[in-house]
Amino acid sequence: SDIIENGPYELEEHVRDIFQTKGLTSKEVMLGIQPLPNQVTRYDTYIYNNSAQYKATPMFKNLLKDDPREEWMLGLLSPKDTIYAITKYVGEKIEECYAIRLTEMYLLKAEATVRAGKDLGDAKEPLKTVMGHAGITDFTKIDAITDRDELLYEIYKETVKNLMFEDGIEWSMLLRFPMEVILKVKPAIREKNYIILPIPAAEFEKNPTIGDQNPGYSKI
């Protein structure tokens, strides 16, 4: 709460401006990274800058249905296309990436408030603030929620809409849910071991006393 209330950062009035015009100069960006000139080509290999490699899944497209962000986050690259591409990163700022934004702090506050067992109204306030800055004006659905698990899932969905294709925070939040919720989003994850990474083999060579490998993996 302190960084939200007393920090030098401000939520961007028009969210798309962060990614398409202002970049790291936006007052919302708390930590951002710009590749050096000799790193741009390598960076472009992995970024979602209108590349045909990155297409919106039906699930993500459905998530943005009737959402103001759909207009600028998804689009057809040509009249012949039938599958929507990710257009969040277009314009002059495609090489800049965002590790931490103030929006994330609001969403973390909302999640922490719910998980701490506090009043749901206190959790809805930062959530609705983020939604409002994204252009949403109807909060009827959020206001009607009385179940903690339901509100947590709405916070997760808003985290995906806001922070997808940035620093992977939406994946971190998903892993904080019970397995049945994770499977709802990622059916391919058939067991808990799928979300646990192995300890690199080199670590066992450097430190023989490190102990056992993580469940589901061998040391070799």
Label every PLM stretch briefly.
Residues 56-57, 200:
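Residue-level signal for threonine
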